Every structure is written in C-alpha cells, then in structure tokens.
Amino acid sequence: MNFPWDQLLVQGNWMITMGQIGAPFAVIAVIAVISYFKLWKYLYREWFTSIDHKKIGAMYLICAVLMFVRGGIDALMMRTQLAIPDNTFLEGNHYNEVFSTHGVIMIIFMAMPFIFGLWNVVVPLQIGARDVAFPVLNNVSFWLFFSGMILFNLSFIVGGSPAAGWTNYAPLAGEFSPGPGVNYYLIAIQISGIGTLMTGINFFVTILRCKTPTMKFMEMPMFTVTTFITALIVILAFPVLTVTLALFTTDRIFDTAFFSVANGGMPMLWANFFWVWGHPEVYIVILPAFGIYSEIIPTFARKRLFGHQSMVWATAGIAFLSFLVWVHHFFTMGNGALINSFFSISTMLIGIPTGVKIFNWLFTLYKGRVTFESPMLFALGFIPNFLIGGVTGVMLSMAAADYQYHNTYFLVAHFHYTLVAGVVFACLGALIFWWPKMTGFKLNETLNKWCFWLFMIGFNVCFIPQFILGLDGMPRRLYTYMPEDGWWLLNAISTVGALLMALGFMFLVASIVYSFFKAPREATGDNWDGLGRTLEWATAGAMPPKYNFAITPDWNDYDTFVDMKEHGRHYLDNHNYTDIHMPNNTPVGFWMGILFTIGGFFLIFETLVPAIICLIGIFATMVYRSFQIDHGYHIPASEVAETEKRLRDARIKEREAVSHES
C-alpha cells in the first residue's frame, strides 16, 4: 500500500494551519462532552441506529444548519477578500477553494439535507403514516449523506479542497487539477448522491403506498405534492450524476479519457451530463420550498390555498420543463443558433407555471385575515425577492443577451436571488414553523423577527450591488481587482450586506438557545394558536408519539383538518385502540456510513487496497441485513391507550390554564 503521505497536510496557509490545529481539539472536546455525560449508549441506541423518521429528520436538520454555518463562513471569507481592491486576505488558489466548497456545501450539503430533514419530519405526519415505506433504507440514506459531508469538509485540512468551481468543469478539473482536491469532490458527492437517490425512492413509495387510504393525490397537502414530484425528479436525475461522477473518477484514478481531449475524450460531455442533472437539481430544492410557502401562507392568512389543483399541475409542469433547459447554462459554448433558440424558449416557458404559483399565493393572501408571525414574514419576503430572481432569469434565458451577462456578477446575483430568496427563506421559515413538532416548544418570536429583517435587508444590500457590478463588467470567480476598476464601493456595500445576513442568522441561533431554556412546553399538537390546516397538527401531542397516530385518520379534502376542528374531531380520539406494529432500530446504516467514509478516504488518495476492503465490508453488511429476520415489535393497545390518555389530559390542563389566564 503506497499511501501519498506527502499530500496529506496542506501547508503554506495560516488559516488552514489553524484549522489543522483546531479540528483535532474540537473532535476531542465533543468526545469528552459525550463521555462526561455518558451519552454514547443513548446516542447509539436512540439516534444513530434509529429508524424513526422524526429523529432522522432532526439529524438531517442539525447537519444542514451546521453546513449553513460552514458555507456562510466561506461566503464571508469571499466577501472579505473582495471588500477592497488588491486585498491579500486570500491568495488566488485558496479563494478558488473557498468559492468551490461554498457552492457545493450550500447546495449539496445544506439545502438538500434541510429539505430532506423537513420531508422526514413532516411528510409521514401529513399523510397519516406511521413511518416511511423503507425505514432501514431511510437510516442508510442519512449515513451515506453524513459520510459524504464528513469527507468533503475534511478536504479543507487534509489534502486540499477542490478548486475548480462547484461545477467542476473538465479539463480544468482533470489534468489541470493534480492532487486529491477534485477527488474529494467526486467521491464525497458520489456517496452522498447514492443516499439522496435512496431518499427519493423511499419518499416516492411512501406517498404512493403509506398515505391514509382516503387521501387522494389531488387532495394532498401541497408540501406532500411537491415532495412526491421532487422525489420523481431525484429518481430520474441522480442516476445521471452517479454515472458522470463515476466516469470522471475513472479518468482521474484509472487514466481513462472520457473528458480529456488529449486522449480522444470530450470536455463538453461533462458540461452536458452535469447540467442534465444540475438544472433539475435546482428544482429538487426549489419545489419543496414552494410547498413550504403553500403551507405557511394559508395558515397565517386563515384561508384555503387558492387554486390548489392548478398548483399541483404547475408543479408537475415545472418538473417536466426542468429536464428541457440544461443548455442555458452554456449558451456561450458555441452550440449554434438553433439549439440555443430551443433552450432559450424552453427556459422562458418555466416562467408560466411559476407565475401561476405566484398569483395563487397572492390570491390566497387577498381578503385573508393575515397575521405576521415570523414564518409568514419569510414567506412574504420570498415573493418580491424571488420575483427579482425570476425576471433576471428571463433576461438570462435570452441567448444573445446571455453572452453579455454570463461570466459576470449579474449571474451570481441572479442565482442567489432564486436560491437564497427561494430556498433559504423557505428553510428558515419552515424551521420556525415546524420547530414545535420536533421539540414541543416554539421559538421566541421577537428574536425570530429580528432574524428575518436583518437577513432580508442584508440579502438585498449584499446582492443588488452585484447586479450593477455585473453590468459594469466585473467577472465572476475573480479573487481580486485593481483600484482603477472602480468596483470598490459596490463590493464594500455587498460585504456589509453579507455581515448583516450573518448577524440575522445569529439572532435565530439566539432564539433557539433562549427558547430551549425559557419557552413554555406545549401540550397541544396544533401549535400555532389552532391555525394548523394539515394532519401534522392533528397529532395527540405537540411532539408526536413514536407511532404518530393511534388510529388512521380520514382525509377527504386538502383542508380536512379545518373541518375536523369545526366538528370537534380535532385529536382523533378513539377508545378502540389496537396493537401497533413498529420496526426495530438497526445498526446497518451507521456501520455502512463508517465503511463508506474510510473507503472513500482511501479512494480519494488513490490507495485502492483499503478502499476495496471497505467495499467488500459494505457488501457484506448488505448481505448480513438481507438474511436477517426482523419482524419488528408491537406497541400493546393498553400502552397506546395510556399514552393517548396522558397526552389528552395534558391538553386539557393546558387549555384550562389558558382559560384561567384570559
């Protein structure tokens, strides 16, 4: 085994050196805290090996928030570098590493796990299910994502991060990027992507087979509809990424030539394959965000969602068109007028179903009794900001104009107005909105609103100047510029905006910490003053029991829960309980994740023998699980009845306390 020890440690940069020193101490500190409080057995039994969709969702969300912090630090480093001309805060290659990892982390390791975490927490509850269709696969999916996340973040201090951009274009990412950096990109995303594909299959089947029998597709909550359609996009798009990453991996490790011109390959093949996955990937994160807004807006407008069926068809239309627009990412690569014209038109067409959604949200607000809780503020802030992203997207869809905009900060501002205003606003609003379902208490509304206003104002202060910089000719991926370029003031303003966004997020962290210690614990499952409109708010307690629902709920309309409350069937009380079957926890996913991490690390450094041994271990684990007889366990009806009575008594006590105070 010839391990390249000379490539292991990155040298010559003080920030990376500090990371190399600090990371081991951070790991030791975490291990020490867990050991001091004797939590290892609890974490392993109740979390690491759990197949409970709610706990898996919480683990996804914890990782996503941590990656939001990591990606945000990358963004602040870039904005600090560009705040003044001729800055030496970051040297050129380090800047390239930072913006490359920023893009990958924010899309692959923040936005997607955030969405998947919400899927896990909310969707089974919304469809009246006890768990997902494949609970063990759900656990495996999480640990594969976690493995990819660990490997990708390890690159900063061990071996060096990828520096060819988040798109990793050949030939720059091929023969012109020696070392393990690009290998980290290929292997980490490959492992995480396999987990993502499993998640897509799991939720597609869950919604088809596990929803309450009376729930019809066109009557499902919009978040569930968008989850179903997004899961289908995942199933269709991610195999393309899997194959493409595998081909590039063989180029780098086994000297094949799929993407190398010198040996008969075609770099443009990578661009096509990448964006055949890459543009549907945008809708993998934005469609569930649309579903989130379709839950929040009717709740705080106290009104039915306007045009529910048209929203379903619009979602399906966007999903279909998402596979027909990938060439607009490289209009400038010389495809020819006919091809560019086709993809220009198909890109513009996406504005039609998206416009339908915008107007439906506005009509939902019209004559509604709107209240401005913090989730609603994020939803309302989304509409005008996302509209800016949409309008500039139509500008970029014109192939002739794209030649002017494409390689400038105008494009950077555009996609941040779609992804931040569309996805990040949704994630933050959803975290606050569904927080009581995970913890049993609400976050502090005052701090939440400070978070919203600082984040939204900072967002516009950060990215509106970038539109102007782009029109003035500032290229993207530029790590420094000269004073005579005249870009200093707008870059400085943009940096101030980024700092405001960071400050806003710190208010959300403060809200979480403050509420953990100070917020009253709630008993009701309908946490937002009884405004809930879907089944996740119909659980017997604020935090659903492990079986979710003691009896299978009925669902006859997308606002059935409102009707249930009007007729006094709010909590599905029933004394004819039966035994409930539940699956057992499993260690399979956890150990597969460890094997993927170790094997992936050795493959990144092109040390094949240990990687092959780990691969054999992975297959052995799968075989072991395949022959394991596990019938799960049953929760006795008496225990269900006792749990439901305890939760019912807590609700009554809480209601009496509120009545006494008023």
Curated annotation (Swiss-Prot):
UniProt cofactor note: Binds a copper B center. Heme A3.
PROSITE patterns in the record: COX1, COX1_CUB
Cellular component terms (Gene Ontology): plasma membrane
Enzyme Commission no: 1.10.3.-
Residues that hold Fe(II)-heme a according to the record: 102, 416
Reaction equations catalysed: 2 a quinol + O2 = 2 a quinone + 2 H2O
Record-listed heme a3 binding positions: 414
Cross-link (1'-histidyl-3'-tyrosine (His-Tyr)): 279-283
Keywords: Cell membrane, Copper, Electron transport, Heme, Hydrogen ion transport, Ion transport, Iron, Membrane, Metal-binding, Oxidoreductase, Respiratory chain, Transmembrane, Transmembrane helix, Transport
Domain of life per record: Bacteria
Gene Ontology MF terms: copper ion binding; cytochrome-c oxidase activity; heme binding; oxidoreductase activity, acting on diphenols and related substances as donors, oxygen as acceptor
Listed pathway(s): Energy metabolism; oxidative phosphorylation
Listed cofactors: Cu cation; ferriheme a
Residues given in the record as Cu cation binding sites: 279, 283, 328-329
Pfam families from the UniProt entry: COX1
Topological relation to the membrane, as annotated: Multi-pass membrane protein
Primary localisation category: membrane
Residues spanning the membrane: 14-34, 56-76, 103-123, 140-160, 187-207, 228-248, 273-293, 311-331, 336-356, 376-396, 415-435, 451-471, 497-517, 587-604, 608-627
InterPro entries per the UniProt record, alphabetical: Cyt_c_oxase-like_su1_dom (IPR023616), Cyt_c_oxase-like_su1_sf (IPR036927), Cyt_C_Oxase_1 (IPR000883), Cyt_c_Oxase_su1_BS (IPR023615), QoxB (IPR014233)
Gene Ontology process terms (BP): electron transport coupled proton transport; oxidative phosphorylation; respiratory electron transport chain
Subcellular location: Cell membrane
Stated role: Catalyzes quinol oxidation with the concomitant reduction of oxygen to water.
Family: Belongs to the heme-copper respiratory oxidase family.
Name used for this protein in its record: Probable quinol oxidase subunit 1
Top-level taxonomy: Bacteria, Bacillati, Bacillota, Bacilli, Bacillales
Gene: qoxB
